[in-house]
Regions:
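N-terminal export and membrane-targeting signals
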Residues: 3-25
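Intrinsically disordered, low-complexity serine/threonine-rich segments
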Residues: 5, 49, 53, 65-68
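C-terminal region of N-terminal signal peptides and the immediate post-cleavage residues
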Residues: 30-54
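Phosphate/oxyanion-binding loops and surfaces in catalytic or ligand/nucleic-acid-binding neighborhoods
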Residues: 43, 88-91
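Extracytoplasmic/lumenal domain signature
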Residues: 56-83, 88, 95-137, 142-237, ...
Length: 515
């Protein structure tokens, strides 16, 4: 699940054993009812609504006060709404792999960050304390247009920091934001132009960061342990979504959150938020508890959203869709409207196409009967609740750790679905029929999500090579390969002629076509 090289394994409590504790807490908060019990221990049709109390900001910027009448739109937005690669895979449906053009000939390295050395720090996992470097899974930088034609890159790294760079030069445009542990996964810039950044860390905290101060300033934190038990782990890997003023995010603590941000500006013109927890939903249900011997239910995928429904998957392979329309409008608990069990760990994000079909990739870790039956890449129709499976593909090649399947998020481009595998390589599948069109072998594992722009596939391998292939024909044709060093677990960001990608070798690189 996610980057095992940096995971802190925990002995997960059995949620059934925690029932007395949960019930006592719920009673104290005034939320004990049959619907809540069903949400936690049956089929999850009703979600747990958190207390309607105002969240207390953590590390708020000193000297800022809230206005008596909050602003409803930013006066000086960082970017036009939805412009740039503001979150993992570019949009709420997790379906934008990049924006061209993309180099078709061997590119040059424009810059390296840092110029020397690497982004490294020590962290502890089940094997002990050791040093980790670079950018890992999923690790896709945000690419944000700024005034006067400038671009800013924003990304987290294994030096425990979030970095903010001029995309043209690789120089820092803001001070790095230091966290308490590895800055894993991908983060999100506010899509509506507010100078806010939403970023998780392995130090148990998801942060909302103001970018209109002298240095990045944490306005609020969501702690993995706040409000209830942690089931499995306490990291934040998935990139949050901001939709209609609400933050949607899942944690490795096995809970899905909806937070109303209440964004605005104070009397000094500085951005402020007044977060209020609207819902906290368990990623498991009674059927999953009955089917699994362990309690590994963490959410490492980035929540996807389409037409009022939020979709996510967990490390037990349960894919769910929750209707949040009334949650947004009235603060009502979300209502589960879709359920499909993959049978094995599903860390890849759900991808939604323009017609509302879902594409989901999972791993082969436990080799359950269900995962053998379903396969590791599926197309689902959430409107067919009784039989949503449209087609499935087996990805049974075995790679690192004796495991198969995929950690990568699918790319759905044109009439083809592209998926990278733990065994090493990329598989192309007909989007309509599920028929395999071709397979491409690469040194594995290939955890980075495929990027396909203008008929060019860009994928990194675990020998430190970033490669490009022409995929407009019946078979992929190699265009170029450039060695960067260090396993490439992260997903490249392709934006208008440049490629930005980090490696486990310690650095982030900017590539562009040669003059």
């Amino acid at each position: 699940m996610g980057d095992r090289s940096v995971r802190r394994y925990r002995s997960a409590p059995d949620p059934r054993a925690l029932f007395p504790w949960l019930l006592a807490l719920v009673l104290a908060l005034g939320f004990a009812n049959a619907a809540l019990v069903r949400a936690l221990f049956d089929d999850g049709e009703v979600a747990l609504a958190a207390p309607q109390t105002r969240a207390v900001p953590a590390n708020a910027h000193p000297g800022t006060t809230a206005p008596t009448k909050p602003a409803t739109a930013p006066k000086r937005p960082v970017a036009a709404p939805k412009e740039g690669l503001w979150t993992f895979r570019g949009n709420a449906r997790r379906s934008l792999t990049g924006v061209g053009p993309v180099p078709r000939r061997l590119p040059r390295i424009v810059w390296r960050y840092p110029r020397t050395g690497g982004m490294c720090s020590a962290s502890t996992d089940e094997t002990g304390r050791s040093t980790w470097c670079g950018i890992g899974w999923t690790g896709q930088p945000n690419v944000i247009p700024r005034p006067r034609g400038k671009l800013e890159l924003r990304f987290g790294a294994y030096d425990r920091r979030y970095h903010f760079l001029d995309a043209a030069t690789g120089r820092e445009v803001r001070s790095p934001l230091l966290t308490g542990d590895l800055a894993k996964g991908s983060a999100t810039s506010d899509p509506d132009g507010f100078p806010l950044y939403y970023a998780g860390s392995r130090d148990n905290s998801l942060r909302v960061v103001a970018l209109d101060r002298r240095r990045p300033t944490v306005l609020w934190k969501l702690d993995s342990y706040a409000g209830g038990p942690v089931t499995w782990n306490d990291d934040w890997d998935g990139a949050p979504l901001v939709v209609k003023g609400h933050l949607l995010v899942g944690g490795e603590n096995s809970w899905f959150y909806v937070v109303k941000l209440n964004r605005g500006f104070d009397r000094h013109g500085k951005v402020r938020i007044r977060p209020r927890m609207v819902a906290r939903v368990p990623s498991w249900d009674g059927r999953l508890l009955a089917a699994r011997s362990d309690r590994a239910f963490s959410i490492e995928s980035s929540v996807a959203y389409d037409r009022g429904i939020a979709y996510f998957a967990n490390s037990a392979g349960l894919v769910q869709g929750w209707d949040v329309r009334q949650t947004f409008r009235r603060g009502n608990p979300p209502r589960r409207v879709f359920r499909f069990w993959m049978g094995d760990d599903t860390d890849a994000s759900v991808v939604i196409d323009e017609k509302g079909f879902l594409y989901v990739a999972s791993e082969l870790e436990q080799f359950t009967g269900r995962s053998r039956e379903v396969g590791q890449l599926v197309k689902l129709d959430p409107r067919r609740r009784g039989s949503p499976l449209v087609w499935s593909v087996q990805l049974r090649g075995i790679g690192r750790g004796g495991k198969g399947g995929s950690w990568a998020t699918p790319a759905v481009v044109g009439d083809t679905v592209y998926i990278a595998t733990n065994a090493g390589g990329v598989v192309a599948v007909d989007r309509r029929t599920g028929r395999t069109r071709w397979k491409l072998s690469l040194p594995g594992p290939t955890w980075g999500s495929p990027v396909v722009v203008d008929g060019v596939l860009v994928e990194g391998d675990c020998r430190g090579n970033l490669r490009a292939f022409d995929v407009t024909g019946r078979r992929p044709r190699a265009l170029w390969s450039i060695r960067l060093g260090g396993c490439i677990e992260s997903t490249p960001a392709v934006w208008r002629g440049r490629i930005y990608v980090g490696t486990r070798g310690g650095a982030l690189y900017a590539l562009a076509a040669r003059p």
